[in-house]
Regions:
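N-terminal amphipathic/basic-hydrophobic helices that include classical n-h-c signal peptides
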Residues: 1-13
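Flexible, charged surface loops at secondary-structure boundaries
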Residues: 10-12, 60-63, 147-151
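Active-site-proximal alpha-helix that buttresses catalytic centers in soluble enzyme cores
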Residues: 15-91, 176-178
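Short, active-site-adjacent cap segments at secondary-structure transitions
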Residues: 25, 75-76, 99-100, 162-164
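Phosphate-handling substructures
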Residues: 28-29, 38-43, 84-140
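Alpha-helical packing segments of well-folded alpha/beta enzyme cores
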Residues: 51-55, 75-78, 133, 137-144, ...
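Short, well-ordered beta-to-alpha junction loops that form the rim of enzyme active sites
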Residues: 69-73, 95, 157-161
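Active-site-adjacent alpha-helix immediately C-terminal to a catalytic or transition-state-stabilizing loop
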Residues: 139-184
């Protein structure tokens, strides 16, 4: 069961078919010491490409009116497979990016993720690491998706932490498909 966005503007219900991107390959970027948003340039791994190809067989994808993707490379590459297989029009949305941690480094990301989960998405004043809260992510999502209210069903290729704000599962696998009704 998916959660309702508490930040509904007009209360228009939209079916969202969430898809987490395929497995990325950070190897080349890490070798060159890329950090922060630089790591978001990572393409899919070979396994991630296979996952995206298999994803294209999912019957729910063909029930959609539109395909919307995060602008981050791993999501956009996954969406390109879906667009080719389904013929759905593709829109790229930079505001559907990965959850933001305001200190760089993989260790900080994992520490922030643990704090986020422990604090149910809140940022405590004493937090040693600053990060985007659950409410901020939901607001960003609703602001971005408001322009698509005229569509009944949208496939959305995005990231685990963003998807988790509407789906109770802590673990969302690469290229997993989750159908939700969300008020936008």
């Amino acid at each position: 069961m998916c959660g309702q966005a508490d930040l509904a503007l007009l209360g228009i219900e939209m079916k969202v078919i969430f898809v987490r991107h395929g497995e990325p390959d950070y190897h080349e970027l890490e070798e060159r010491s890329y950090t922060g948003f630089g790591l978001d340039l990572a393409p899919l791994s070979e396994q991630g490409r296979r996952q995206a190809q298999e994803l294209c067989q999912h019957p729910l994808l063909r029930s959609a009116d539109l395909l919307v993707s995060s602008a981050m490379t791993r999501a956009l590459e996954t969406a390109s497979y879906v667009a080719c297989a389904t013929g759905l029009p593709l829109r790229v949305e930079p505001l559907l990016h990965e959850w933001q941690v305001y200190q760089t480094g993989r260790g900080n990301f994992e520490k922030a993720r643990s704090l986020f989960l422990e604090n149910n998405g809140a940022l405590l004043p004493s937090s040693p690491i600053q990060y985007e809260t659950a409410e901020e992510m939901k607001a960003r999502f609703v602001d971005c998706m408001a322009k698509y209210r005229d569509y009944q069903t949208v496939v959305l290729v995005a990231h685990r932490m963003l998807i988790r704000q509407f789906v109770p599962d802590r673990q969302i696998d690469f290229c997993q498909v989750i159908e939700c009704e969300i008020e936008i």
